[in-house]
A protein has these predicted regions:
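Short, charge-rich amphipathic interface segments used for partner binding and complex assembly
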Residues: 24-65
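Short, charge/polar-rich alpha-helical segments
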Residues: 1-15
Length: 66
């Protein structure tokens, strides 16, 4: 598999993971707040980190495409 294909696959994987964390955060807001407020910091941090990892993967792909 070429480097570009690997990077594209990584971007898709990271996007899926970020979306999954975002969905968990959404579910918390829709279904368990305000009672589940103590879950908020952990879910927010995990979502933030997953989005950062996705962004890094996108940047790596763009750099490789140049």
């Amino acid at each position: 598999m070429t480097e570009l294909l690997q990077l594209e696959k990584e971007v898709k994987k990271r996007k899926r993971m970020a979306s999954e964390w975002a969905m968990q955060l959404h579910d918390l807001a829709e279904e368990r707040l305000p009672a589940g407020f103590e879950e908020l910091p952990q879910l927010a941090e995990a979502t933030y980190k997953a989005c950062q990892e996705w962004q890094r993967a996108v940047k790596a792909l763009k750099a490789a495409q140049r």
